[in-house]
Structure formats: structure tokens, C-alpha cells
Amino acid sequence: LFGYAHVPWMKTHQRLIDESRMPDAASRWELMTLANERLRSLGYVQIGFDHFAKADDPMVLALKAGKLTRNFQGYAVEDAATLIGLGPSAIGTLPQGYVQNVADTGAWHRAIAAGRLATARGIALSDEDRLRRAIIERLLCDFAVDLDAVARAHGMTGRRFAQEKVRLNDLARDGLVELDGERIRITELGRPLARIAAACFDTYLDTGKA
């Protein structure tokens, strides 16, 4: 259940849309809530904050088993170490980091026709990046995370997130999250806004390099 992203500065064809006829934030929230309630009334189980599946779907089974994952395409049932992006602007995941193809369709075609990769840029992940990625993934998949457990799994025992907890406390006061030592749980009220809680652990947002 994806919301429409109006980015005319990036997608120039969107400039043809009369913005005065677009729903405002309150209307978008109401539409999302109605769609959410309708899908759940029909027997669909909510997966994360934007996916829905039948109760016997592999994605629901992965959710119950704590094995749900998330990639650039959304939620998934397989934690693949490598995800290859094929088309223009597609993002690929490698054990070492991420790569992205050139966005221009013509340039992409020329690279492929010449037998070359159409990769335009990439980024290598540090140990800190991998730790934060795991925390964000658990928050978005399980709506909960044990910071100590994730840190231990990444060989970073004793890692503390003081600044992140300050931000989370603001959300806790609004009833969106609950904090219990090193454990974080996103409440039912906060689930539609799970990305806000997860963003507390994204250091690249503050630098403009996300």
C-alpha cells in the first residue's frame, strides 16, 4: 500500500499535475487508514507498514518466525546477500555494499549494448553501517529490536546509542514507541510511522548523503 510520491523536481512529467487537486496530508492519512482497515477486514495480515498478505502466505509465516527481511523493493522472505539491479537507476546489493545503475535510459542502453555494466556509483559499507542497517531492518520488519542482541551479533558488544535514544524519547512521549533499556518497540499507534523511528539510526540523513 504505497503512497504516491510527488517529486516534480525529479520527475518532470509530474509538473503536468494540478497540485491544487491533490489530497493534503490529512486526506492521504485518512485514505491510507481506510485502505488498511478494508484489507484487514478481508483477511489480509499487515506486513510491516505497507504490505499485506493472506494468513498462509510465506511472507506472513516469515513474519511470525522473525525471519522477515526488507530490501529496496520492500519486504521479502529471503535474506539474499546479493540482489542484482537490472534496469536504469536500479540499485543492487552486494556483501560489500550497494551499487546503482545509471538513471538515464539512453546511457543504460549504450552501456549494455557495449557489453559493459551500467553501474554509475556505489558505496562500501563499514561495520557501523552494517550494524545500523540491521537495527533499522528489525524495526521495520518486527517493529521491535534488542540493541544489545544486534550489537553482539555484529561483534560490537557494549555499543550504546545515546543520541538515538534522545530522539526516540520524543516519539515515546507521543506514544509511538516504548523503550525498555536496550529494547525498542514500536506501538500499534506508531506502526504507520515506523520509518520515523528507524530514521533515528540513519546517520546519513543528517549529512544529506542518504
Could you say what each language-model-derived stretch is?
Residues 189-210:
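Short, amphipathic alpha-helical interaction segments positioned at domain boundaries
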Residues 172-182:
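A short, conserved structural fragment
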Residues 157-173:
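Short amphipathic alpha-helical interaction segments
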Residues 183-187:
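Minor-groove-contacting beta-hairpin "wing" of winged helix-turn-helix DNA-binding domains
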Residues 1-156, 209:
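C-terminal scaffold of the Radical SAM
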Residues 48, 160, 180-181:
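A generic structural-conservation signal
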